[in-house]
Curated annotation (Swiss-Prot):
Its cofactor is heme b. A motif (GXWXGXG) lies at residues 71-77. Pathway: Nitrogen metabolism. It catalyses: peroxynitrite = nitrate. The lineage of its organism: Bacteria, Bacillati, Actinomycetota, Actinomycetes, Mycobacteriales. Its EC number is 5.99.-.-. InterPro entries: Calycin (IPR012674), Nb(III)_bact/plant (IPR022939), Nitrobindin (IPR045165), THAP4-like_heme-bd (IPR014878). Homodimer. Belongs to the nitrobindin family. Heme-binding protein able to scavenge peroxynitrite and to protect free L-tyrosine against peroxynitrite-mediated nitration, by acting as a peroxynitrite isomerase that converts peroxynitrite to nitrate. Therefore, this protein likely plays a role in peroxynitrite sensing and in the detoxification of reactive nitrogen and oxygen species (RNS and ROS, respectively). Is able to bind nitric oxide (NO) in vitro, but may act as a sensor of peroxynitrite levels in vivo. Keywords: Heme, Iron, Isomerase, Metal-binding. This is Peroxynitrite isomerase. One of its GO terms (molecular function) is metal ion binding. Binds 1 heme b group per subunit, that coordinates a highly solvent-exposed Fe(III) atom.
């Protein structure tokens, strides 16, 4: 696995194409993705979660800087673990219910060398929102990402939008259960890249205390 690059470098910036091209690409994708949404129970009295901004309850204005993330994303990536590098498939669902937070669910599965399903991989669920910057409350709002990992730990990130289509976050706190995996903090960078895909890289602190490549992926929009 090569050293992580920023999504703009790894997959090409969406801004490298003309505005007309970007609009045309989005319109073409929407022919397939615009009619899709996540399954929900329709007999609950509260607003249903939606991963399609064309459907469901109105989007909360407090989250406009995170709006491009909403959708269902699917694709493949590369990881580095204690036993070497590996490939994985992944689905990320980013939905909302009109509240001042985004719902986040990421599921991954290991792939064989030929690209076939091998076994269950990492899974995490959590919430994105904006809060007062813990480092400087007088400054602009910070992104807060709270995640629970199936590997047995809870992680709190803070960060900021880098521009209208990329977001950077760093671990602020981490709590591990007795059965949980021993991990260090992380740095994540997400970005919407050329073609409208969602790309990200994650580095994690290793035993020597330095950030090392851990995960990277490029995911195509499936819903929204």
């Amino acid at each position: 696995m090569t050293a992580p690059q920023e999504p703009e470098d790894a997959a090409g910036s969406i801004f490298s194409t003309s505005g007309d091209r970007a609009v045309a690409d989005a319109a073409e994708r929407a022919k397939v993705t615009a009619s899709r949404n996540i399954p929900v129970f329709d007999d609950l009295p509260l607003p249903a979660d939606t991963a399609n901004l064309r459907k469901g309850v109105d989007f909360n204005d407090a989250l406009l800087a995170l709006l491009p993330l909403v959708g269902v994303w699917r694709g493949e990536g590369e990881g580095r673990g204690p036993h070497g590098d590996y490939r994985f498939g992944q689905q990320i669902v980013v939905s909302h219910d009109g509240g001042d937070y985004l719902n986040w669910e990421a599921r991954s599965w290991r792939l064989t060398e030929s690209g076939e399903y091998d076994r269950v991989g990492l899974r995490e669920t959590g919430f994105w929102r904006f809060v007062s910057d813990p480092a400087d409350p007088s400054e602009s709002q910070a992104i807060e990402l709270l995640l629970a990992h199936s590997a047995g730990y809870i992680e709190l990130f803070y960060g900021h939008p880098r521009n209208q289509s990329s977001w950077e976050l760093v671990t602020d706190a981490l709590a591990r259960s007795k059965s949980g995996m021993l991990v260090g903090g992380a740095k994540r960078l997400y970005g919407i890249v050329e073609g409208g895909d969602l790309a990200y890289v994650e580095e994690r602190v290793d035993a020597d205390g330095g950030l090392v490549p851990h995960l990277s992926a490029r995911l195509a929009r499936y819903v929204g």
